[in-house]
Amino acid sequence: MIKNPKVLILTAHYGNGHVQVAKTLEQTFRQKGIKDVIVCDLFGESHPVITDITKYLYLKSYTIGKELYRLFYYGVEKIYDKKIASWYANFGRKRLKLLLQAEKPDIVINTFPIIAVPELKKQTGISIPVYNVLTDFCVHKIWIHREVDRYFVATDHVKKVMVDIGVPAEQIVETGIPIRSSFELKINSDIIYNKYQLCKNKKILLIVAGAHGVLGSVKELCQSFMSVPDLQVVVVCGKNEALKQDLLGLQEKNPDALKVFGYVENIDELFRVTSCMITKPGGITLSEAAALQVPVILYKPVPGQENENAMYFERKGAAVVIRDDSEVFAKTEALLQDDMRLLQMKEAMKSIYRPEPADHIVDTILAENHVEPNHIPIKSPALAQSFT
């Protein structure tokens, strides 16, 4: 039995999702009395220049680099073999060896497809349990390695795909994707309407525009939606200050029709009162939407995991997928007017959601390593007041 295990969580800053999952798992371990938890951006620390370049290319995949990313994602999936695995395993390997020697973790968790640890296990024979937490509603072969002890996945569909690839079913646990605990709290919606100055007698359309300009023509969209009766548009610009300032002029003209925010710390509050949301199909965003049963309109998914996520939610009846700018207004307005379909989409979201995924994952890991959790109760936070 390990009394005070040290946990190493490896992640990467490609989008916010992988890091957010790592932080959620870290917080969950700490809540259960496991204090020695380290979160490391292995690629960023090992190869900062290469990481900056690849992060730039990743962001460009939203605009000019879609075909390049399609080729990378699906091309690597088709030709992935031992040579590619060996080449990829060298990324971060030197830093990893130093990290393992210095920290001597008892448990390693990947929230990004980093195969350096299982590859090191294979080559050196070190005995350390390795867990992969998949952060999308699909699986790429790059996540899979014989030396990974267990995989935590979003859905039974992902599990079936992995079994077909050759992963033993007993190594895969369907838990859902870890999300922030705030999305699983109960909050009085009246408080939210008052806090954000929203109209209870209007439907609310939430547009999550993001900080990297991944949602096109936001201003024009807002102008169109502002003409729809009994609709209030809420735009979250993230850290895109230029977009926020551009939209504030529209808000001043008709504050009852449009509300503009920058970065919203407790965005779950807006999820709770929206009728539907326009967003990109990231795995964490979709998991959060499923937790609060928010129908989603998925805007122009990038080829790769975004497209796979979007197709899964579309098949389940939980999402409308937009692949052309000209479709956004008409399809969104039609959905907002169709209460029956909105209800069906909410039910579909409910069927996808898996409650308390972070707890499920952490409890499983601790049980497998014979650790007795010492749960530290945490009071439910008061409704956050900070948003910009």
Curated annotation (Swiss-Prot):
User: Known EC number(s)?
Assistant: 2.4.1.315
Pfam families of this UniProt entry?
Glyco_tran_28_C, MGDG_synth
Keywords in alphabetical order, please. Answer: Carbohydrate metabolism, Cell membrane, Glycosyltransferase, Lipid biosynthesis, Lipid metabolism, Membrane, Transferase
Gene3D superfamilies in UniProt: Glycogen Phosphorylase B (3.40.50.2000)
Report the InterPro entries cross-referenced here: Diacylglyc_glucosyltr_N, Glyco_trans_28_C, Glycosyltransf_28_UgtP, Pro_diacylglycrl_glcsylTrfase
List the GO biological process terms: enterobacterial common antigen biosynthetic process; glycolipid biosynthetic process; lipoteichoic acid biosynthetic process
The broad enzyme category this protein falls into is transferase
Which purpose does this protein serve, as stated in its record? Processive glucosyltransferase involved in the biosynthesis of both the bilayer- and non-bilayer-forming membrane glucolipids. Is able to successively transfer up to three glucosyl residues to diacylglycerol (DAG), thereby catalyzing the formation of beta-monoglucosyl-DAG (3-O-(beta-D-glucopyranosyl)-1,2-diacyl-sn-glycerol), beta-diglucosyl-DAG (3-O-(beta-D-glucopyranosyl-beta-(1->6)-D-glucopyranosyl)-1,2-diacyl-sn-glycerol) and beta-triglucosyl-DAG (3-O-(beta-D-glucopyranosyl-beta-(1->6)-D-glucopyranosyl-beta-(1->6)-D-glucopyranosyl)-1,2-diacyl-sn-glycerol).
Q: Which HAMAP family match?
A: Diacylglyc_glucosyltr
The text of the family note is: Belongs to the glycosyltransferase 28 family. UgtP subfamily.
One GO term in the molecular function aspect is: 1,2-diacylglycerol 3-glucosyltransferase activity
Q: Which domain of life is it from?
A: Bacteria
The pathway is: Glycolipid metabolism; diglucosyl-diacylglycerol biosynthesis
Q: Which GO terms describe its cellular component?
A: plasma membrane
What name does UniProt use for this protein? Processive diacylglycerol beta-glucosyltransferase
- Cystine pairs annotated here are none
Q: Which SUPFAM superfamilies match?
A: UDP-Glycosyltransferase/glycogen phosphorylase
The compartments listed are: Cell membrane
Reactions catalysed, as given in the entry? a 1,2-diacyl-3-O-(beta-D-glucopyranosyl)-sn-glycerol + UDP-alpha-D-glucose = a 1,2-diacyl-3-O-(beta-D-Glc-(1->6)-beta-D-Glc)-sn-glycerol + UDP + H(+); a 1,2-diacyl-3-O-(beta-D-Glc-(1->6)-beta-D-Glc)-sn-glycerol + UDP-alpha-D-glucose = a 1,2-diacyl-3-O-(beta-D-Glc-(1->6)-beta-D-Glc-(1->6)-beta-D-Glc)-sn-glycerol + UDP + H(+); a 1,2-diacyl-sn-glycerol + UDP-alpha-D-glucose = a 1,2-diacyl-3-O-(beta-D-glucopyranosyl)-sn-glycerol + UDP + H(+)
